[in-house]
From Swiss-Prot:
The lineage of its organism: Eukaryota, Metazoa, Chordata, Craniata, Vertebrata. GO terms for molecular function: deacetylase activity; serine hydrolase activity; triacylglycerol lipase activity. This is Arylacetamide deacetylase. Belongs to the 'GDXG' lipolytic enzyme family. Residues 1-5 are cytoplasmic. The active site is at 188, 342, 372. Displays cellular triglyceride lipase activity in liver, increases the levels of intracellular fatty acids derived from the hydrolysis of newly formed triglyceride stores and plays a role in very low-density lipoprotein assembly. Displays serine esterase activity in liver. Deacetylates a variety of arylacetamide substrates, including xenobiotic compounds and procarcinogens, converting them to the primary arylamide compounds and increasing their toxicity. It is a single-pass type II membrane protein. It catalyses: a triacylglycerol + H2O = a diacylglycerol + a fatty acid + H(+). A motif (Involved in the stabilization of the negatively charged intermediate by the formation of the oxyanion hole) lies at residues 110-112.
Amino acid sequence: MGRTIFLLISVVLVAYYIYIPLPDDIEEPWKIILGNTLLKLGGDLASFGELLGLNHFMDTVQLFMRFQVVPPTSDENVTVMETDFNSVPVRIYIPKRKSTTLRRGLFFIHGGGWCLGSAAYFMYDTLSRRTAHRLDAVVVSTDYGLAPKYHFPKQFEDVYHSLRWFLQEDILEKYGVDPRRVGVSGDSAGGNLTAAVTQQILQDPDVKIKLKVQALIYPALQALDMNVPSQQENSQYPLLTRSLLIRFWSEYFTTDRDLEKAMLLNQHVPVEFSHLLQFVNWSSLLPQRYKKGYFYKTPTPGSLELAQKYPGFTDVKACPLLANDSILHHLPMTYIITCQYDVLRDDGLMYVKRLQNTGVHVTHHHIEDGFHGALTLPGLKITYRMQNQYLNWLHKNL
């Protein structure tokens, strides 16, 4: 009898631990629940270790994610190599089939909340191989310094210097890339860095080669308003909750947990920077269907001292949605994927609107049954569907 009760209690506790609310139209929910449970377990262990003072939360999660790392092994379709671009590690994928013309080039930036991730992760290695083979393109997948060891602007600067190196005529010639067909792409935090470096590279007089396209996959684009409708509506959905998103943002700037606490309350933007809120005012930038009866409330003013200590969240290099229209107007053809069940959905939607308002050619794919991270999760139907949409657009436009 005692064993039966113990077993019953154990089953209930396990079920409670793994349960997450999922919308009815999410495909293959048990695969998502399993993946989310593994991430949740790793996160809880990391939190426990941090509570005991054993290790920083993100350092522990990085250790757990090491199982994702795969070697730069060439296959029957693609030659894979590793090198440095201006002291930044990159992994390069070159199709093996003969080409009589110069190939297009894609510079890819991985996600991971500026704290996790690597070009060597299985999910990014797989995507880069598929991209190189499918598009007959040279793919450069870049790494960059990660928090908590490094904070903004290190991540931006690493990616910027790496891309700038790639855009030299002699480097493109070395890898057989057509200088008229170079694009940049990234997912999540990589989408953030994609938008940021694309804006800044336009203003660099020493960079003569222009990017043809940029592709942003569920990008994080602003850290001023942490209570947009998608953050309220999707706050507990996998694989990125609102609390984890805010932890990533705050770690990007500092290990000082005071910033995280202020961001959780949406009370971190001081009055002195309130003029920037016009660029992220979802009440004027979101289509009506995504507002769903939410009422806009200006974020409660925060501490000027906090903003002065950690100015990154008011810097356009960290938050590309803060760029002036005069900058956005000159951006290249843009592709943006947003997902309905993603806390970052509204960042992407607002950027679509702002780019369209300034005359940029934008293709926007909204995945009605999509969620954060779906582009690179192995073995899911939605992953293949999203990758095909993404690669089809690149094939047509790059």
